A protein has these predicted regions:
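N-terminal module-boundary/linker segments of secreted carbohydrate-active enzymes
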Residues: 1-53, 59, 64-74
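Acidic (Asp/Glu)-rich catalytic clusters
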Residues: 12-15, 41-49, 78-88, 109, ...
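Substrate-binding cleft of secreted/luminal carbohydrate-active enzymes
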Residues: 16-27, 95, 267-299
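Aromatic-lined carbohydrate-recognition surfaces of secreted/lumenal glycan-active proteins
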Residues: 22-25, 160, 164-166, 190-223, ...
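Solvent-exposed loop/turn segments at secondary-structure junctions
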Residues: 27-29, 59-62, 97-101, 167-171, ...
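Conserved, mostly hydrophobic/aromatic
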Residues: 54, 163, 236-238
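Substrate-binding cleft of extracellular glycoside hydrolase catalytic domains
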Residues: 59, 63-199, 203
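Glycoside hydrolase catalytic-domain groove-lining segments
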Residues: 217-224, 228-280
Length: 299
């Protein structure tokens, strides 16, 4: 859509300008000691402004559930997305989708969830056209698509957002991760998802972001970043999830690598997840996060 193209250009220009958009997951829905308070966010409480990026999760939409994986009613989430978009915030979405082969209500964690990696045939069966799991997963994608198409502004125009399907695929804990799929199977799953949502369901409001897990210092950081790369035509945005703790070297080396890859691929990039819960070091963001970003532009 024109709005999606404008948002993509905005990400590119922000990155080139040397500025960065700060985000917070579920920022408008809940925080420390509060939940469902209109107009509130922890970031606003601390800084006076809402975060520039608002991230949320589609998890559980595959079951037509009332609430998402974090307990936010989907109707409420739609309201929050509209509110954020009206304010000029950038929306980013992930999808902790349950395991379509093992899911059943009431199973003990992690059985049937995104983190159920007990079967390494799930991806293989999903991408096999006409298989029972392929049929099941298309139904799940239909439900996701119906919700995405309901994300419109006050004029009824589709709200653009960054979509991070199959995130952290470099690790082994999800059913689509390194333990449960081959390189070819993962790439096929990515393409199947994109083409089904775009071509079959007519969704054109998403910027597709890949986001490998990047927590350490790696011998070949670029190789890790492009692990199971689906192809330049199937990735719009280069992300990374970096929970480096207090390992400044890990964060700095990964930020440098993603900024270089961004130039090479001519695509915007960003740190799609990072931080420490309950951080008690006041200068964490300025001394450990911002310092690494000063000479390595990301959006």
């Amino acid at each position: 859509t024109p709005e999606t193209k404008a948002m993509y250009q905005y990400l590119l220009e922000t990155q080139k300008s040397g500025h960065i958009l700060l985000g917070h997951h579920d920022a408008l829905a809940y925080g420390h000691g509060w939940r469902d308070t209109p107009g509130k966010s922890d970031v606003k409480e601390m800084t006076g402004s809402h975060p520039a990026v608002c991230s949320m999760d589609f998890g559980k939409i595959e079951h037509n559930a009332e609430k998402n994986i974090n307990g936010i009613p989907f109707d409420k989430m739609r309201e929050l997305i509209r509110y954020a978009y009206q304010r000029g915030q950038t929306i980013m979405m992930c999808w902790h989708v349950d395991n379509p082969k093992t899911y059943a209500p009431g199973k003990p964690y992690p059985q049937g969830t995104s983190w159920d990696n007990s079967d390494n045939t799930v991806v293989r069966e999903i991408i096999q056209e006409g298989s029972p799991l392929n049929t099941t997963f298309k139904t799940w994608l239909d439900r996701l698509a119906a919700y995405i198409l309901s994300l419109t502004d006050e004029q009824g125009k589709p709200i653009p957002f960054i979509f991070r399907p199959w995130h952290e695929h470099t690790q082994s804990w999800n059913w689509w991760g390194s333990k449960c799929a081959t390189d070819e199977e993962f790439r096929a799953l990515w393409e199947f998802t994109l083409r089904y949502l775009r071509d079959e369901k007519g969704i054109h409001q998403m910027i597709y972001a890949i986001s490998p897990q990047m927590d350490e210092v790696y011998p070949d950081t670029q190789k890790r970043l492009t692990y199971r790369w689906p192809g330049d035509k199937l990735v719009d945005f280069i992300g990374m999830d970096c929970y480096h703790g207090r390992n400044k070297k890990a964060f700095a080396s990964n930020v440098k690598a993603i900024a270089e890859l961004s130039v090479q691929k001519q695509k915007p990039c960003g740190i799609t997840e990072t931080g420490i819960e309950g951080v008690n070091y006041p200068a964490y963001f300025t001394e450990e996060v911002q310092a690494a970003l000063e000479n390595n532009p990301v959006s």
